Each structure stands twice: as C-alpha cells, then as structure tokens.
Amino acid sequence: MQIFVKTLTGKTITLEVESSDTIQNVKAKVQDKEGIPPDQQRLIFAGKQLEDGRTLADYNIQKESTLHLVLRLRGGLNVKVRTLTGKEIDIDIEMTDTVDRIKERVEEREGIPPVQQRLIYGGKQLADDKTAHDYKIEAGSVLHLVLALRGGNF
C-alpha cells in the first residue's frame, strides 16, 4: 500500500509499505529516499509519536494515510519515562530542558497533566525548575513517573 510522509518544509514523500512494516522499517525507507538517518526522524500520526518497534497496523495506519516527519534536533537526547505499569515512553529532550518541560512532553504523549506528575531519577524527585543537565540525565536514562493524587502533597 502507499502512504505519504509530509516534512516540515511541506514536501510529501510517497512510500510503498505493508501494514506489517515496523516504524523502524518506514524510517529506513525515508532514509533511502531522503538520506535522513532514522535516529534523527520522529514520525507522527494522529498527534502521536510512533514507536520504532510497533507496526503500521498497530497504529491503524491504512493506505493513503499521511504521517508527519519531524527531525530531532542535534544535541537532543532520548530518555525513557517508565510508568508504574511498566510502560516506557520515549521522549526527546535537550540538556537545557527544565523538568517542567519534560513533564509537558509526557503530557503530549500520554495526556497526563504536569501537575499530576512526579518524576524520579536516581532515587530523587525532580524539581520543576531544574534542568536535565542539573540532574546529569543522559541519553538512555530512565525516569520513573509516579502520579500524584490530587490534594496530596508530597
């Protein structure tokens, strides 16, 4: 089947894919056509960032669907946010991002308001006004997400 990938410059790339293709496969096809390394690609469909190991079928992407390609900034790094259910969310951050900004990224992906999020790294709860750099968060780091009950102060 054919799908389309639209870049931020407005260019549309046509790809021949199968619904069983993984997002990683799709990124490889984008690389073949455009020369953009997969690790710099972020594919978005219906407002959600698509995860490499999932398939087009997992996201109900059908023929003639349009994905949006966003390039990851150099200097950015990918971290994982692990929920209490064990689900891992991949998030791109910059070293200069505040914890509050990281929480906004979690909200974009999961719909959880930042005020309800507590992020833990290295056994410490992270303060909203501190940066990833302050906590020495690096690529591949795993942050733990705990939900704060409304009205509960920790």
Curated annotation (Swiss-Prot):
<dbReference type="GO" id="GO:0005737">
    <property type="term" value="C:cytoplasm"/>
</dbReference>
<dbReference type="InterPro" id="IPR038738">
    <property type="entry name" value="Nedd8-like"/>
</dbReference>
<keyword id="KW-0963">Cytoplasm</keyword>
<comment type="similarity">
    <text>Belongs to the ubiquitin family.</text>
</comment>
<keyword id="KW-0832">Ubl conjugation</keyword>
<keyword id="KW-0677">Repeat</keyword>
<keyword id="KW-0833">Ubl conjugation pathway</keyword>
<dbReference type="InterPro" id="IPR029071">
    <property type="entry name" value="Ubiquitin-like_domsf"/>
</dbReference>
<keyword id="KW-0539">Nucleus</keyword>
<dbReference type="InterPro" id="IPR019954">
    <property type="entry name" value="Ubiquitin_CS"/>
</dbReference>
<dbReference type="GO" id="GO:0019941">
    <property type="term" value="P:modification-dependent protein catabolic process"/>
</dbReference>
<protein>
    <recommendedName>
        <fullName>Ubiquitin-like protein-NEDD8-like protein RUB3</fullName>
    </recommendedName>
</protein>
<feature type="propeptide">
    <location>
        <begin position="153"/>
        <end position="154"/>
    </location>
</feature>
<feature type="cross-link" description="Glycyl lysine isopeptide (Gly-Lys) (interchain with K-? in acceptor proteins)">
    <location>
        <position position="76"/>
    </location>
</feature>
<dbReference type="Pfam" id="PF00240">
    <property type="entry name" value="ubiquitin"/>
</dbReference>
<keyword id="KW-1017">Isopeptide bond</keyword>
<feature type="domain" description="Ubiquitin-like 2">
    <location>
        <begin position="77"/>
        <end position="152"/>
    </location>
</feature>
<dbReference type="InterPro" id="IPR000626">
    <property type="entry name" value="Ubiquitin-like_dom"/>
</dbReference>
<dbReference type="GO" id="GO:0031625">
    <property type="term" value="F:ubiquitin protein ligase binding"/>
</dbReference>
<dbReference type="InterPro" id="IPR050158">
    <property type="entry name" value="Ubiquitin_ubiquitin-like"/>
</dbReference>
<dbReference type="GO" id="GO:0016567">
    <property type="term" value="P:protein ubiquitination"/>
</dbReference>
<dbReference type="InterPro" id="IPR019956">
    <property type="entry name" value="Ubiquitin_dom"/>
</dbReference>
<feature type="domain" description="Ubiquitin-like 1">
    <location>
        <begin position="1"/>
        <end position="76"/>
    </location>
</feature>
<dbReference type="GO" id="GO:0005634">
    <property type="term" value="C:nucleus"/>
</dbReference>
<feature type="cross-link" description="Glycyl lysine isopeptide (Lys-Gly) (interchain with G-Cter in ubiquitin)">
    <location>
        <position position="48"/>
    </location>
</feature>
<feature type="cross-link" description="Glycyl lysine isopeptide (Gly-Lys) (interchain with K-? in acceptor proteins)">
    <location>
        <position position="152"/>
    </location>
</feature>
<dbReference type="GO" id="GO:0031386">
    <property type="term" value="F:protein tag activity"/>
</dbReference>
<dbReference type="GO" id="GO:0003729">
    <property type="term" value="F:mRNA binding"/>
</dbReference>
